[in-house]
Amino acid sequence: MEESVNPTIQLGPVTFNLTLLAMSLLAVLLVFAFVYWASRKMTLKPSGKQNALEYLYDFVIDFTKGNIGSKYMKNYSLFLFSLFLFLVVANNLGLMAKLQTTSGENLWTSPTANIAFDLSMSFLITLICHVEGIRRRGFKKYLKAFVTPGFMTPMNILEEFTNFASLALRIYGNIFAGEVLSGLLVTLSHQAVFYYPLAFGLNLVWTAFSVFISCVQAYVFTMLTSMYLGKKINGEE
């Protein structure tokens, strides 16, 4: 994917990437539309679209419950389910199309292929984990985990920063790399007519592989979020 200047808007000292905002909103709307469509006219005996929605929900619960614990699982199940669905959609948006203006502005990309978005999302997840930990355990008991034993305090603080950074960089590296190679294959197909069949075939295979990787990254991000959250609300017990 070649470098391009995305359209932006300036609000005071803050610059907003309009492409990133639009694609993030699109991902949210797609998730909402899917859940709304699948949950309409729900019955006690699920089938079809309702069955698919419940399967996805149970899937998320199954791989996160061990980290959160049965005591608090019902409080965070919808949060984790929504996070997983959003990431599945957001990770794959950039693979669906390649849209650029004549001046090279990229108008279609995965939100998670942007490091600023991933760092912001990771920061928000970290903040939620800390806030929920304090709310569930109390400030004094929560703070004690950082200073007991005393010689581990620097390592405990460093761990918070490494968790925050790794959560963002892991998903960014995988999604961005997928879009870069996909973009290069599209560019190759434009070089000459005889390159097109090769580029098309390779891009088809790579897109399928990237969809798989994107779903795996959504799984990993949600799993790690549940691990961090479970550790904060349950302590080291």
Swiss-Prot record:
Pfam families: ATP-synt_A (PF00119). GO terms for molecular function: proton-transporting ATP synthase activity, rotational mechanism. It is a multi-pass membrane protein. Keywords: ATP synthesis, Cell membrane, CF(0), Hydrogen ion transport, Ion transport, Membrane, Transmembrane, Transmembrane helix, Transport. It is found in: Cell membrane. F-type ATPases have 2 components, CF(1) - the catalytic core - and CF(0) - the membrane proton channel. CF(1) has five subunits: alpha(3), beta(3), gamma(1), delta(1), epsilon(1). CF(0) has three main subunits: a(1), b(2) and c(9-12). The alpha and beta chains form an alternating ring which encloses part of the gamma chain. CF(1) is attached to CF(0) by a central stalk formed by the gamma and epsilon chains, while a peripheral stalk is formed by the delta and b chains. Key component of the proton channel; it plays a direct role in the translocation of protons across the membrane. This is ATP synthase subunit a. The lineage of its organism: Bacteria, Bacillati, Bacillota, Bacilli, Lactobacillales. The gene is atpB.
